[in-house]
Amino acid sequence: MKLVDLSLTEFAQVLGSDAPAPGGGSAAALSAANGISLTKMVCELTLGKKKYAEFEAEIAQVHAESARLQESLLAAIDKDTEAFNLVSAVFDMPKETEEDKDARREAMQQALKEATKSPYGMMEDILAALQTTQKAVGKSNTNAASDLGVAALNLKAGLQGAWLNVLINLSGVKDEAFVADYRSKGEDLLQKGCALADEIYQEILKVV
């Protein structure tokens, strides 16, 4: 069964158990999925309201993008665990001969690279989600303004959590060019996303 098909209670219980997965990456994805879901909810509460008619087209676009990102971030909950499982599987590979050990080392490097790409992709989606959320600020139902603030907070937590998962996987990668590339790109996403989340939060504080 996929993690996304578990109830909230079941997910929390397996997350809090001694099972090797899910872990922080899946939790970060869930946080981000919750964030963009709140943005989508605010759009639902705005569309069709006469008071916000002038923003109807813009909010409809935000709604569509939120729905797409919601689906992607929900999928990331399981993708992160699947990436972790690839790394775990390497430990079950034979290590009796030198050939075995070489194959094991190569497999581990490939698995760690894939495990890096998963949370990095999540970071890309989260930055897009924050940019989408910002478009709704000041143009959506004011009764749900606080929900946009909570959306930004959840997205920021997801972004920072995904970054930590990028870093921990990069720490085992020997390919220096790969490490430098993903560290540089990841730091850029982190800086832009955190700044945007803080900006949204401060804007919401002015109206609640």
Task: Annotate each PLM feature.
Residues 129, 144-203:
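Preference for long, well-ordered alpha-helical segments
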Residues 3-21:
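Short, hydrophobic/aliphatic alpha-helical segments
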Residues 42, 70-77, 84, 116-123, ...:
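A structural signal for well-ordered alpha-helices, especially hydrophobic packing surfaces
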